[in-house]
Amino acid sequence: MKVVEVKHPLIKHKIGLMREGDISTKRFRELATEVGSLLTYEATSDFETEKVTINGWNGPVEVDQIKGKKVTVVPILRAGLGMMDGVLEHIPSARISVVGIYRDEETLEPVPYFNKLASNIDERIALVVDPMLATGGSMIATLDLLKEKGCKNFKILVLVAAPEGIAALEKAHPDVELYTAAIDEKLNDKGYIIPGLGDAGDKIFGTK
């Protein structure tokens, strides 16, 4: 599995700001969008382009356009919605596929409860977004579902990943690519990433 920890100074700075314990909902939400945007820039750097001719201001002109890449953005509810707009800033025509999975606080196992996927998802590259890759259970369950529907190409975008989650994801889905702004130290006994960001969903939505 390809794992890319994006070490651009802007990303590192913004993730550092997100670690503040008393950060406001507004600021956390803004930063989640901004880092999601920067991760998208990195994750799409290998998209192929082709030459096409358009009508320019002074007649025909040859330009580069992305070649035949249909994209669907897949936010994992609910926290993944906080990164979605950052992706759409770069790919505004992307279709949106929504997957609802929550983590049982007792067992830490993923529990699917909803999905609404783009048509022809088997022909699309899926950019799956979720702020935290902790145990990896929710991400693995999401990829299981997408593969069942015929999707073959995946790029995973997360703000923070734990080594345990990376290992679990690689074991279950070695064919995907993971892009993260930070690889943190470990999980605690409750399955939270240390040092992490806290509960990203609560911070994005202003709930507890």
From Swiss-Prot:
Binding sites annotated in the UniProt record for uracil: 193, 198-200
Co-factor(s): Mg(2+)
Cofactor remark: Binds 1 Mg(2+) ion per subunit. The magnesium is bound as Mg-PRPP.
Binding sites annotated in the UniProt record for 5-phospho-alpha-D-ribose 1-diphosphate: 78, 103, 130-138, 199
Domain of life: Bacteria
Catalytic reaction annotation: UMP + diphosphate = 5-phospho-alpha-D-ribose 1-diphosphate + uracil
Molecular function GO labels: GTP binding; magnesium ion binding; uracil phosphoribosyltransferase activity
InterPro entries in the cross-refs: PRibTrfase_dom, PRTase-like, Upp_B, UPRTase/APRTase, Ura_phspho_trans
Job description of the protein: Catalyzes the conversion of uracil and 5-phospho-alpha-D-ribose 1-diphosphate (PRPP) to UMP and diphosphate.
Protein family according to the UniProt entry: Belongs to the UPRTase family.
NCBIfam families named among the record's database cross-references: PRK00129.1, upp
Entry protein name: Uracil phosphoribosyltransferase
Native source organism of the sequence: Aliivibrio salmonicida (strain LFI1238)
Taxonomic lineage: Bacteria, Pseudomonadati, Pseudomonadota, Gammaproteobacteria, Vibrionales
